[in-house]
Amino acid sequence: MFTLKKSLLLLFFLGTISLSLCQEERNADEEDGGEVTEEEVKRSFLDTLKNLAISAAKGAGQSVLSTLSCKLSKTC
């Protein structure tokens, strides 16, 4: 259970750093003129897909943790 918490925390931390870098890049692009290129559209789509996958993994992890907790404490 501790290992799962550490890995979820690591995913959250890496996602936060990635989001921060993307926001900095967007701000720099806005200062340059605000034109959206095809590469930026792809990057935005992949970033959204990645965030969706991370949130799904977090939800699944929480579900597994609650089930394991229930079974270990024999309160199910």
From Swiss-Prot:
Its main location: secreted. Disulfide bonds join C70-C76. Residues 23-41 form a propeptide. One of its GO terms (biological process) is defense response to Gram-positive bacterium. Pfam families: Antimicrobial_2, FSAP_sig_propep. It is found in: Secreted. Keywords: Amphibian defense peptide, Antimicrobial, Cleavage on pair of basic residues, Disulfide bond, Secreted, Signal. Expressed by the skin glands. Antimicrobial peptide. This is Lividin-2.
